[in-house]
Amino acid sequence: MSIEAIFDNDVGSIVAPAGCGKTQLITDTLVIKPNKPYLVLTHTTAGVAALKLRLKKLSVPTKNFFVTTIDGWALKLAKNFPASCPVLTSPENPRAFYPELRRSVLELLQNGNLNDILRASYSRLLVDEYQDCNFLQHQVVTELSSLIPTTVFGDPMQCIFNFAGRMPDWNSEVQARFPLIHELTVPWRWNNAGSHGLGLWVLDCRNILSQGNKIDLSTCPGYVHHKPLVGVVNTDLQSQQTTQYDIFNRAQNESLLVIGDSINARSRHKYAQSSRNIDVVEPVQLDSVANAARSFDGAQGIDLVDAILTYSGEMMTNVQRSQTLQRLRTIQAGRNRTPITSLESALFNVIQDSSRNNILAALQQLESKHGAKVYRKAAFAALKDTISLSSSMPDQTILDAASSIREQLRLRGDRRIPQRAIGSTLLLKGLECDHSLILNADNMNAQNLYVALSRAAKSVTVFSQSNFVGV
């Protein structure tokens, strides 16, 4: 379709199956010089980062657009108008905070006080991944669409953020407000990679799964590879990692996304911990960083060192918490027979002076320790950024700094999405790669399976007990 169809409709929707040119259509739209910036909203920081990267490659002037998450934009609005848009709940209680934020922003939009400001600020609103909007977010976008021209892009078969309250019905509520402009049907992701057959297969899977049927993984030889699970954890893990290394060896300079358990984040962390060159894609909430900050705020001396080692040990290998604590106690008692290392010196400084600068120095020494591998790079970088920021704001807590870092990432998008990484369908949706490795497709519903199958442009490897999948 041409972008003229977007500009010809003040409100409308485009149904966009995965890999069918939606992102290109959005970027082509943003290339057209506006008289005021475009507002582009999506759901994940990874999606924000991916879109910004595409726009940067196309040299689209940043003055043409403002890209962020829906909640990131809502938070920015609430902070700019705190008296008119009060949010009393702490962001550290996200289950209460974000619904309150959305309700408060919705009320602010409904009272009409910002109508002139919003019309003067943006020329058009584009909302990506619209199938993941809950009803409050849908109401917010609906209010905005009465002020500025609005196009929403989505695919009901990719609706996997449906666990946080009521979702608008796509036919009776979404398309009632945003009539269908066009449905994309050309599998550009795979055509551009020379994998036309895989693209047609993924589109066919979408139709089969949408009708409630299972798909047969043996029907796309050469592109889709089925690997059996035997139900023995260590045996299956060894098989999965052997397959991963085989992909690395045959595609040394190409990207790989490993799609793990959507519920059990620890299982994804353990996979990355025991694998070479696999990083972890983190949720935007960054709970582990907030928990570390909270722990650091409440500790001093050897207890603070213990907290530093504990949380670092959840993000990197070879921390050796118990051994290190015992060694520090030996040093503290003056019984050490071997010289103090630079890491031990940094940790001992924390015992003597629990300053934030000393905490940061200790984290940096842990990172450079021989044999250490940071397998959660985004989380560890955010933790260091948190401590660094907290050093410049001594009147506030480390947890306050963690909240600031998290909202910065939410607003601008996480730019540190690695080329070879593990995540869940929730975290990886909107991303694309050369190859994908699905660790267990047996318990995936139709939507999660379709999202998982449609990430890779060149090959898909699926572990499951049977070659027929799709609950």
Across the structure, where does each feature detected by a protein language model lie?
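The feature marks helicase ATPase cores and/or their adjacent C-terminal helical subdomains
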Residues: M1-V471
